[in-house]
A protein has these predicted regions:
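Hydrophobic, lipid-facing positions within transmembrane beta-strands of outer-membrane proteins
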Residues: 41-44, 100-104, 113, 134-138, ...
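Outer membrane beta-barrel
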Residues: 1-122, 132-134, 140-149, 206-212, ...
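C-terminal hydrophobic structural anchor segments
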Residues: 208-256, 260
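Sequence/structural signature of outer-membrane beta-barrel proteins
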Residues: 16-27, 66-68, 86-89, 120-127, ...
Length: 289
């Protein structure tokens, strides 16, 4: 739900419920939302835009996704992939797509360049919930000739048990996006530590193709890896390849299918097939006169 409240203040509110059934351990169907059988508020925030001269300033306050890298829900949900990237999944020693902030952010920029600074307290959902404490996120973004490149940094409390997870969770990341003629590429690379004495590096690159010749089909492919280095058996070196499609059957109904080949992921086989159907309902309120 979104709209304008008063005097140029915009609001966004989102609630979700998801459930995963079965005894097999999997990271399927967690692209942008938790599947823990609880109804919860994901985002609830207000924005105010200011335009001093050629610049643009956006002030945001409330509960919102941690603005690190490619972090929007629409960047990952219902886009053709049924699993989050490895560096964006709960419990894979990186930065989950379910990390959120209770706080405020200020974004300031001119055409083709912006800087965003955020301060808040963790408000995470899902399995990887950070411990309470002030955290900060800084992101810069530049665009040139159809390419958008961003650099991000985050410092926060870890989400693992304080019995062994000392220090802070700190990551730096690089992301890029490009689109032309129905072909889009995007990807992220991340490096840092989930807590002291460990190191996580990894990234992914996504290809999306939606050309007139494909009709209702959007083809997708992903290549990714994640390396978690620690001096115990929990070290993880994972690789995953995904090929699939999003098929629009009706204006409100679509199918998504993924074929997966992977290695190095605990408790998961080398191959998988994911299939999902999405039905959309939309309600538009009449404009006030």
């Amino acid at each position: 739900m979104f709209g304008e409240a008063f005097s140029g203040v915009r609001f966004t509110a989102e609630a979700v419920w998801g459930a995963r059934y079965g005894t097999t351990q999997t990271d399927a169907f967690g692209a942008a939302y938790p599947y823990d059988r609880d109804l919860k508020v994901m985002e609830a925030f207000a924005d105010r835009i200011f335009r001093p001269g050629p610049a643009l300033v956006v002030v945001r306050a409330g509960r919102f996704r941690t603005p690190f890298g490619i972090s929007g829900a629409s960047d990952h949900a219902y886009a053709g992939f049924l699993r989050a990237p490895l560096i964006r999944y709960d419990n894979y020693w990186a930065l989950s797509n379910n990390v959120l902030e209770h706080g405020a952010s200020v974004t300031a920029g001119v055409p083709r360049f912006l800087v965003q600074a955020t301060a808040g307290l963790p408000a995470d959902t899902g399995a990887a919930v950070r411990h309470s404490g002030l955290d900060g996120v800084l992101r810069t973004q530049v665009s040139l000739r159809g390419v958008i490149v961003g650099v991000s940094g985050v410092s926060s409390k870890p989400y693992m048990s304080p019995r062994f997870a000392r220090g802070r969770m700190q990551f730096a990341g690089l992301d890029a996006r490009w689109m032309n003629g129905g072909v889009a590429l995007k990807g992220e690379w991340l490096s840092g530590q989930p807590f002291d004495g460990t190191k996580t590096t990894g990234g992914y690159i996504d290809l999306t193709v939606h050309r007139p010749a494909l009709g209702p089909v959007t083809a997708v492919a992903r290549a990714e890896r994640l390396d978690y280095t620690v001096n115990n058996p929990r070290a993880m070196h994972a690789v995953r390849y995904v090929a699939g499609a999003r098929i629009r059957l009706l204006d409100t109904l679509s199918l998504q299918a993924n074929v997966i080949r992977q290695s190095g992921i605990p408790n998961q086989g080398r191959s998988a097939f994911d299939l999902a159907a999405t039905y959309v309902l939309r309600f538009d309120s009449p404009r006030s006169q």
